[in-house]
């Protein structure tokens, strides 16, 4: 059996529309890479096609994960399928507007420069609300997923909840900055309303492709980290299961479940840490002593908790 045929067999029971959407956005991501190569225009210091590329990759991961999660539901699968269909439609409509603005060399988010730009951003903002509502409903339904492995049981639930938290953190970027408020007070109209950079204006030096500021805080970081808990925690459960042949202690599904819960708590701490760091106008690549101390404490807490779980006495069969 070829790899492609094996993949088709494994994913046959997944929710079809979101599965196809995930695959389609993977192809779109490749096209965005090609666009980056041939179109060297920049916007606010970043390649014009970097944002469509990031959204395509995130969309692919997001829809493939939800396609799998919907297949795990013993009840409400039809409702979850309809909600996931709505996610595909809304996200695709938003993505079309994002690409349209990129092709024009215009910012898609926070753009208030012209009536057309403002209208596009307002429409996208309403779409984001729709995405959040549908994701919230799906997160509630995920609590009914049927998974026999306890580690996966908790990974799916914790991942969905933390992902919703990460999506919600995007609201922090929509508030006007001090400079924008000052411009309003003097009778002006700012071209941009909202920002992802904290402490400086958007458009400064940033990490390649990701674009995260290297000189100030960046609210895209907690948004990204939180949103992808949906993939990280299930992958943790899968990794622990794969290690059972090498580490006999992990053959106990209770041990793996507890390690997943420790990982989920640590991941929640990471989301809080990078949110706090960003709001303090501190770059991800230049943490101060306070941030490093908090990070060290988080790592130590996760490490000690994991050690305690593994070292706890094994269950004795009745």
Protein language model regions, located:
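Membrane-interface capping segments at transmembrane-helix boundaries
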Residues: 305-318
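Membrane-helix interface/capping segments
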Residues: 69-79
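Non-cytosolic membrane-interface motifs at loop->transmembrane helix junctions
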Residues: 43-52, 110-123, 150-154, 182-187, ...
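Hydrophobic cores of alpha-helical transmembrane segments in multi-pass integral membrane proteins
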Residues: 17-37, 49-71, 85-103, 123-138, ...
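Short, Lys/Arg-rich, polar N-terminal cytosolic tail immediately upstream
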Residues: 1-14
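Extracellular/periplasmic helix-loop-helix junctions in multi-pass membrane proteins
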Residues: 246-254, 276-292
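Interfacial segments of alpha-helical transmembrane regions
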Residues: 79-87, 144-168, 182, 255-263
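Membrane-interfacial catalytic/cofactor-binding modules of polytopic membrane enzymes
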Residues: 178-229
């Amino acid at each position: 059996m070829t790899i492609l045929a094996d993949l088709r067999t494994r994913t046959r029971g997944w929710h079809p529309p979101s599965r196809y959407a995930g695959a389609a956005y993977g192809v779109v991501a490749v096209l965005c890479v090609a666009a980056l190569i041939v179109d060297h225009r920049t916007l606010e210091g970043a390649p014009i096609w970097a944002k469509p590329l990031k959204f395509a990759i995130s969309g692919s991961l997001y829809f493939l994960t939800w396609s799998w999660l919907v297949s795990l539901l013993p009840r409400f699968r039809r409702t979850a399928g309809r909600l996931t269909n709505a996610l595909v439609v809304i996200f695709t409509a938003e993505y079309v507007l994002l690409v349209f603005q990129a092709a024009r060399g215009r910012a898609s988010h926070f753009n208030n420069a012209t009536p057309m730009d403002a209208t596009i951003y307002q429409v996208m903002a309403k779409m984001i609300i729709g995405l959040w509502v549908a994701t919230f409903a799906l997160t509630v339904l995920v609590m009914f997923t049927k998974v026999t492995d306890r580690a996966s049981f908790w990974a799916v639930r914790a991942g969905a909840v933390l992902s919703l938290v990460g999506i919600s953190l995007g609201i922090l970027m929509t508030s006007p900055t001090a400079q924008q408020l000052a411009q309003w007070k003097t009778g002006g109209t700012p071209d941009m309303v909202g920002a992802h950079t904290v402490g400086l204006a958007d458009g400064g030096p940033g990490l390649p492709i990701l674009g995260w500021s290297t000189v100030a805080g960046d609210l895209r970081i907690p948004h990204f980290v939180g949103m992808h808990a949906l993939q990280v925690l299930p992958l943790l459960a899968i990794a622990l299961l794969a290690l059972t042949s090498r580490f006999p202690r992990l053959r106990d599904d209770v041990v793996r479940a507890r390690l997943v819960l420790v990982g989920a708590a640590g991941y929640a701490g990471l989301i809080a840490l990078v949110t706090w760091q960003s709001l303090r106008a501190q770059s991800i690549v230049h943490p101060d002593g306070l941030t490093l101390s908090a990070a060290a404490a988080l790592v130590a807490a996760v490490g000690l908790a994991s050690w305690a779980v593994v070292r706890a006495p094994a269950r004795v069969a009745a």
